[in-house]
């Protein structure tokens, strides 16, 4: 059943592939805008181990009933001995025109000056409007604090101390890249690689870039 839901959610979205020439155009467009953080998930390097998700849970004190991040194992092809998987990161897209911000009655859901969509815990009343409005289904209500939670690129736990998000540091395959969207590292990667962005109806442009990749894995290893 979980595979069916994921397949349906992915099927509803718009997938736009870009090449290096397109990324240079994006870079020129962004020069006049505010600084934005962005993340790259290189699916060709990701092995689906979910070490990033476990590190995120520990660092950000997520309960067992909720998660800021997960790597979905989506079967693409199947045979007797091996299955080809697409490892897809499920987390906040930090999208422009985020519906979670629009529906929040207290202003607890907001975007900071670096483009990170965040939750102000002291203002959240636990109404779950933002959770229902998120088309990606990547928010949850913490059963202990009764506050909405989601990926915020470790804004308080890591970024404020000068460290990248814990998922980036924990990934054993170096499948995650994080930084200012206009930084040389991010722009060089976008220039040199074919990538895509996944956007669902009702949400604005995401700030999560993805490089498509699939992996053949023996069934007993998954």
Curated annotation (Swiss-Prot):
Binding, [4Fe-4S] cluster 1: 46, 49, 52, 171
Amino-acid positions noted as binding [4Fe-4S] cluster 4 in the UniProt annotation, renumbered to this chain: 104, 124, 127, 130
Binding-site residues, [4Fe-4S] cluster 3: 92, 95, 100, 134
TM spans (from-to): none
The record's account of how the chain is modified after translation: Predicted to be exported by the Tat system. The position of the signal peptide cleavage has not been experimentally proven.
Any Pfam family the entry gives: Fer4_11
Ligand binding ([4Fe-4S] cluster 2): 56, 151, 154, 167
UniProtKB keywords: 4Fe-4S, Iron, Iron-sulfur, Metal-binding, Repeat, Signal
SUPFAM superfamilies given in the database record: 4Fe-4S ferredoxins (SSF54862)
Name of the protein in its database record: Uncharacterized ferredoxin-like protein YdhX
Species of the source: Escherichia coli O157:H7
Gene expressing this chain: ydhX
